[in-house]
């Protein structure tokens, strides 16, 4: 089973990706992990990517695509895989499609975890973390017993910079611009599947399993 996972920041993609990977015995392939591995191992592609990053430039599609292609040709991908963070652009989606066509293979589905912006804002901006022990809370869904204080060590909990309203809105804007064309791309190919990401984690996963069925 070959799956592309789509969804906004804060949609719970990481949690669901792990569950999908375990249930269907396919590797969860994160673009971030691929980049880190290539850079840490000083592969030719990693060195090239690091050069762009160090200069404050975006890594070109060609480099990213080649990294992903290399990963998809490893033995553990023979039974399928779950792609998370790739493709991000229609050009990358086209490249993935061409790669699969050349191998006489095809994508099974592009799975979109749908969550409204207002829900994401509430979920992400309400997150709090203890800077001392790392415990995490949510002002609405999982508040500390003593308001503003960590239950474990008593330190004052804080909001991370990534979770401010301004930052979350910026990330959602970027996601919308990047992903809407992808949603249309996969929709036109009849490959788009959607699941309601506002439900409880186990309910979202149940919905995903219903969409994916027992295929492997």
Curated annotation (Swiss-Prot):
What is one process in the GO biological process aspect for this record?
AMP salvage
Residues holding ATP: 10-15, 127, 136-137, 199
One term under GO cellular component: cytoplasm
Query: Does the keyword Zinc feature in the UniProt annotation?
Result: yes
Report the domain of life of the source organism: Bacteria
Listed under catalytic activity are: AMP + ATP = 2 ADP
LID, as annotated region: 126-163
Q: Name one GO molecular function term.
A: ATP binding
Which InterPro entries does the protein's record reference? Answer: Adenyl_kin_sub, Adenylat/UMP-CMP_kin, Adenylat_kinase_CS, Adenylate_kinase_lid-dom, P-loop_NTPase
Binding of AMP occurs at: 31, 36, 57-59, 85-88, 92, 160, 171
Q: What is known of its domains?
A: Consists of three domains, a large central CORE domain and two small peripheral domains, NMPbind and LID, which undergo movements during catalysis. The LID domain closes over the site of phosphoryl transfer upon ATP binding. Assembling and dissambling the active center during each catalytic cycle provides an effective means to prevent ATP hydrolysis. Some bacteria have evolved a zinc-coordinating structure that stabilizes the LID domain.
Supply the NCBIfam families for this chain: adk, PRK00279.1-2, PRK00279.1-3, PRK14527.1
Its function, per the record, reads: Catalyzes the reversible transfer of the terminal phosphate group between ATP and AMP. Plays an important role in cellular energy homeostasis and in adenine nucleotide metabolism.
Report the family membership: Belongs to the adenylate kinase family.
Q: Could you identify this protein by its name?
A: Adenylate kinase
The primary gene name is adk
